[in-house]
Amino acid sequence: MANNASLEQDPNHCSAINNSIPLIQGKLPTLTVSGKIRVTVTFFLFLLSTAFNASFLLKLQKWTQKRKKGKKLSRMKVLLKHLTLANLLETLIVMPLDGMWNITVQWYAGEFLCKVLSYLKLFSMYAPAFMMVVISLDRSLAITQPLAVQSNSKLEQSMISLAWILSIVFAGPQLYIFRMIYLADGSGPTVFSQCVTHCSFPQWWHQAFYNFFTFGCLFIIPLLIMLICNAKIIFALTRVLHQDPRKLQLNQSKNNIPRARLRTLKMTVAFATSFVVCWTPYYVLGIWYWFDPEMLNRVSEPVNHFFFLFAFLNPCFDPLIYGYFSL
């Protein structure tokens, strides 16, 4: 997202904004060289992620057509289909929005699209994070409680539906907190317009609570669930192998079950690793900014852009991971 003009939240400023009165500010943001590089990389990753995820969906569709009529997709492929759709949604919404916003620097699309696109952006970020949680839970249950999973055919669909519903609901506040502000640049009648959350919260701690809630739902909670599920899978596989050492011969055809479980473990670990590597720099920078807004003046702009670009790698890596392990 383009760097916004810095504003201190005080009653006078908020009153001015609520009455659409321009505010006189200092130097306004412009598109710099590092910003142009960020835009170029963003659109390159957009093309890459779109191609990868669309290709996987196409392969999945062709694979489905070759199956016998009436035979359903496996649980894992259904989950991967929804994760791919979520990643594709994030790719088609977040990346073009970020790229275009950095090009224009300010917001020209009006308050309605300011609210709607901000909502869609967060919704498309929640969806893949929650779908990763569903996959981790499902794989953990499939290995630790296989009979319970097989006897409850609706469990998977219920978790998938819940992930989409929570994504829709949790992104809802974006429609309220985002709004337009208009600033005069101090050198004439030129007006700078931006889509921001400034003055949307009565108290500073309200915004802090919302930021940490979003951070927790997008990163901390999914990460903890993935780690716990992976630990349970490792523990279960280790216990099975200790009970029957012959199952260590995973390359033999008669040991398809433990080999499939090992593949499941590798895939879930790869998902968790990709999630951590891609999103940690993004959230480290975000948390730093929440506690110290002046950090943007101390951290070089190229480093700032570089950290944010890491998040766009995740929807590119995911189709490579599940394509390698599932097809």
Swiss-Prot record:
TM segment ranges: 39-58, 78-97, 116-137, 165-184, 212-231, 281-299, 306-325
Tissue specificity annotation: Pituitary gland.
Ranges facing Cytoplasmic side: 59-77, 138-164, 232-280, 326-327
Keywords: Cell membrane, Disulfide bond, G-protein coupled receptor, Glycoprotein, Membrane, Receptor, Transducer, Transmembrane, Transmembrane helix
Glycosylation positions in this chain: N4, N18, N102
Keyword Repeat recorded: no
Residue spans, topological domain Extracellular: 1-38, 98-115, 185-211, 300-305
Example of a GO cellular component annotation carried by this entry: plasma membrane
Localization in the cell: Cell membrane
Protein's name according to its UniProt entry: Gonadotropin-releasing hormone receptor
The species this protein was found in: Mus musculus
Gene name tied to this protein: Gnrhr
